A protein has these predicted regions:
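Conserved P-loop NTPase motor cores
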Residues: 312-314, 443, 450-484, 497-504, ...
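Post-Walker A helix-loop "phosphate-sensing" segment adjacent to the P-loop in P-loop NTPases
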Residues: 485-495, 508-509
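P-loop NTPase motor core of the ASCE superfamily
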Residues: 100-101, 540-586, 729-816
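Extended, folded cores of ATP/NTP-driven motor/assembly subunits in large transport
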Residues: 1-410, 420-421
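P-loop NTPase motor domains
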Residues: 35-53, 64, 276-279, 292-299, ...
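Charge-patterned, long linear interaction tracts outside catalytic cores
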Residues: 125, 439-445, 450-452, 457-470, ...
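Short glycine-/polar-rich loops that comprise or flank the Walker A/P-loop
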Residues: 53-56, 109, 490-492, 517, ...
């Protein structure tokens, strides 16, 4: 029953001397693709299958395991900076928590493709005939030795080299359409051990040795080494196998396809993709495909057509009506014959086998029922042939033959391409900051926010900026806080603008990094007067001048297009910039010194703001020193008593206090430019909460683009936290945003805007429903590779949940 005779690199010889070349198909992301994109993938896979005019193809979807500990250890290697010790301790605690929740390993589906290598016809001459006779004779001798001694298997070196050349050509053809990796001996070892009931070993940690002895004309391997991964006691029952190892036992059952009722319409027939999301337990699938070349296929179809016509004639002669089955079959055969004749395409004999395993019989029965129901819903009828379990088991082994002909399905390449082989949902990186898990696949999602600027292969953006959008209470602030916290732990530096003063308790709530948290609370005390004056807060005089103009035009409503007022204001600001004592109060003095009706008017207008509420923070007389230090790893700037306008309020409707509040945000955000221009070797984050407040005004929009562009050059990411995707959807900004997070929204226009922002089909009802039905803490995530999926944000630690939760506390009455 064991088909493998010899393995060399990714080549497998079977007992019938057929040679297969095996590859791992690197999975491609399939979630949230438009119908058009799905058809492009479908077409590529159809061409991949159709390029082989003869031979066999063996496709395997195997549920392997990946080690959580290994991923977390790799993540620790990314940690740098002052908080390295705290970060490593946090990651270790996180690892233990994750392992206790989901075990040491998580299921990871891998896709393997084996192609039979077809021998090219050699020129018929005496030399080749002698060579062929000699090969046959030596093979006979080896077979006798092997039968008598049963100790080694040999393979002529000429034979190996011949097939290796053919494999190179094949690999070149395949890799034009899909990313593939040649299998190694470890892969084959894992595959065999997995099929024989061994689990609990992470794929990347598994090792298998197959020592070879290379002689002058042949290479030898020990037969024992070849079959070592299959060690176990197998007990065959009618409908299942019992696999027993020293320390455990498992039960395995095999299904095969009995019939496909009706059509499997694409896109919606991607069985390989959907079953990854459907089942909470591992399921393996094998497709053994034999290619029937066009002429043979046409002959078979025409013979079938004759049989059906005979049945039709027989019914006519007997005076009875032809059954509807025969009429339908005749129509189908006519259509198929025409299709094959025109396209010259091959047909495919498909043996489709599903492997279900479980630790005990009851669980096996439950899992088998679930698999059967899933396929039933797709109009695919499965059977478990009694007494054929061991034979179907052998179909999963590399280079195996089709075991049974009773359940063969004749299909075209369209059908095989529509099954979604290799399709999966991938999100984020393999290591980095653990943010949560994919809602569809349950796989952990890791992010590396600083990676975008490194130009990693496959990324579709080099923008470090991120956007967090969604309606109130969906979890965007929580997710944003969590990402910033871990980015700081991993060695980054952050400046958070906290307009609602929600982060004031972080020092108490996060004691392990309290010494690196700097909270600057700008209250309306007289001591803080002038602290936010552009000339005080900005190091660069040119930046200070430009910010002063922005703030004063914003407050007074003077447009740069106003030919009377703007030049007067501009001249006054320039005079102050060139003087020794710089401050916004001096601009008023300069305007009064001008002493024209226009300058007096502007001076009075600006002066009317100076003593209004907390406006004195913006105005200094040039004697104030900058007291805001950003040397800590985590810096939070709060301005007390800010009153932000409602989201729907237009700029013309802003009240005076709202105008002042937004101007404060603009000043602090511009101050972030100095922070961005600090040490380029450190990844920095400028976090702008309630970003919509200044993104909706012209000065704020210009500033945001300036921040993002400066950030890209200086390894700094600007994080926009806002309620609507519209705020960050303007082309100039949208194209400079990398990571995108979208939380629940119920407004249909907002949903469409968000989907468009993510670059996915906004009119697709399924996409709209996904966004509408998101639960609290779930978000749509687009990673640096342009892949989109739904993530459940998972803080792991309760103290982080309490620290970052911005919801108002619930009053509870204590029951005595």
């Amino acid at each position: 029953m064991f088909p493998i005779k010899y393995i060399d690199n990714n080549l497998v010889w079977n007992k019938d001397n057929e040679v297969f070349a095996y590859y791992e198909l690197i999975p491609y992301n399939y979630s949230f693709l438009s119908a058009e994109q799905k058809f492009i993938v479908h077409d590529s896979f159809r061409q991949l299958i159709a390029q082989s005019r003869e031979g066999k193809i063996h496709a395997l979807q195997i549920a392997t395991e990946s080690s959580i500990r290994s991923m977390q250890e790799q993540s620790k290697k990314l940690v740098t900076g002052k908080l390295k010790e705290v970060a490593c301790q946090k990651i270790d605690e996180q690892t233990e928590a994750l392992v206790s929740m989901i075990g040491d390993n998580q299921v990871d589906y891998r896709f393997f493709l084996g192609f039979k290598l077809m021998v090219t016809e050699e020129q018929l001459n005496l030399k080749n005939i002698k060579k062929s006779v000699w090969l046959t004779f030596t093979e006979f001798l080896h077979e006798v030795n092997h039968t008598l001694m049963n100790d080694f298997v040999s393979m002529p070196n000429d034979e190996i080299n011949r097939y290796m050349k053919m494999e190179k050509l094949l690999e070149n053809k395949i890799s034009r359409r899909f990313k593939v990796r040649r299998l190694e001996i470890h892969d084959f070892g894992y595959l065999m051990e997995h099929l024989y009931g061994r689990d609990g070993i992470a794929y990347e940690d598994y090792e298998y040795q197959l020592p070879k002895k290379k002689l002058n004309k042949e290479t030898l391997i020990k037969y024992y080494d070849l079959i070592r991964p299959t060690r176990c006691v197998i007990e065959e029952s009618q409908r299942y196998l019992r696999l027993e190892h020293e320390d455990k036992e498992s039960y395995v059952s095999y299904f095969t396809v009995n019939a496909i009722v009706g059509e499997l319409d694409f896109p919606s027939s991607e069985i390989f993709y959907f079953q990854q999301q459907q089942f909470t337990f591992p399921v393996d699938t094998s497709m053994n495909v034999e290619i029937v070349e066009n002429r043979k296929a046409l002959t078979t179809v025409r013979n079938k057509k004759k049989e059906l016509k005979d049945l039709d004639n027989h019914a006519y002669q007997a005076g009875s009506e032809t059954s509807s089955n025969v009429v339908d079959a005749l129509d189908s055969v006519d259509e198929l014959e025409t299709d094959l004749d025109q396209t010259k395409e091959s047909m495919y004999k498909l043996s489709y086998v599903i492997r279900v395993s479980a630790p005990d019989l009851d669980e096996l029965k439950r899992r088998c029922d679930e698999v059967k129901d899933f396929y039933d819903d797709l109009n695919v009828k499965l059977v478990r042939p009694a007494g054929d379990m061991l034979g179907l088991h052998s179909e999963f082994l590399p280079a195996s033959k089709r075991y049974i002909n009773d359940y063969v399905q004749y299909v075209k390449s369209d059908f095989l391409a529509g099954l979604g082989f290799g399709a999966t949902q991938q999100l984020g990186e393999t290591t980095g900051i653990y943010m949560g898990y994919s809602v569809d696949t349950g796989r952990n999602v890791y992010l590396q926010p600083s990676l975008a600027s490194q130009g990693v292969k496959g990324t579709v953006t080099n923008a470090l900026a991120s956007a967090f959008v969604g309606s109130l209470g969906g979890g965007k602030s929580f997710c944003n806080n969590l990402l910033v916290y871990y980015a700081v732990l991993f060695g980054g530096q952050a400046l958070l603008l906290d307009p609602k003063s929600e982060r004031g308790n972080w020092k108490e709530m996060l004691p392990e990094i309290a010494h690196e948290i700097n909270i600057v609370n700008l209250t309306s005390d007289k001591d803080n007067a002038g602290l936010l004056d552009p000339f005080v807060i900005m190091k660069n005089v040119k930046d200070a001048e430009s910010l002063a103009i922005d703030i004063l035009t914003f407050l007074t409503g003077i447009s740069s297009r106003d030919g009377e007022k703007f030049p007067v204001l501009r001249k006054a600001v320039r005079s102050v910039t060139q003087s020794d004592s710089r401050g916004l109060l001096h601009v008023i003095d300069e305007l009064r010194r001008e002493d024209t009706p226009i300058s007096r008017n502007i001076a009075d207008h600006i002066d009317s703001f100076t003593d209004y509420d907390f406006a004195h923070l913006l105005f200094s007389d040039g004697t104030v020193e900058n007291a805001i230090s950003l040397d800590n790893q985590l810096n939070i700037i709060q301005v007390a008593d800010l009153v932000l306008p409602d989201k729907d309020t237009t700029f013309e409707e802003y009240t005076t206090i709202e105008l002042l509040s937004v101007s404060m945000l603009i000043v602090i955000s511009t101050f972030a430019l100095d922070f961005i221009h600090s040490d380029r070797s450190i990844f920095k984050i400028v976090d702008l909460d309630e970003a919509w407040a200044f993104l909706n005004v012209a000065q704020g929009e210009t500033l945001s683009n300036k921040l993002v562009r400066a950030g890209r050059a200086m390894q700094a990411g600007v994080y926009f936290v806002t309620q609507s995707a519209y705020d960050v959807s303007k082309e100039s900004l949208k194209n400079n945003i990398g990571l995108k997070f979208a939380f629940r929204s119920t407004d249909i226009n907002e949903i469409k805007q968000t989907l468009e922002f993510f670059g996915i089909d906004k009119d697709d009802e399924n996409n709209q429903k996904r966004l509408r039905d998101l639960e609290n803490g779930q978000c749509l995530l687009q990673d640096l590779y342009g892949r989109v999926g739904v993530v459940q944000i998972h803080p792991v630690f309760e103290e982080l949940l309490h620290a970052f939760d911005t919801r108002p506390p619930v009053q509870r009455n204590e029951v005595e």
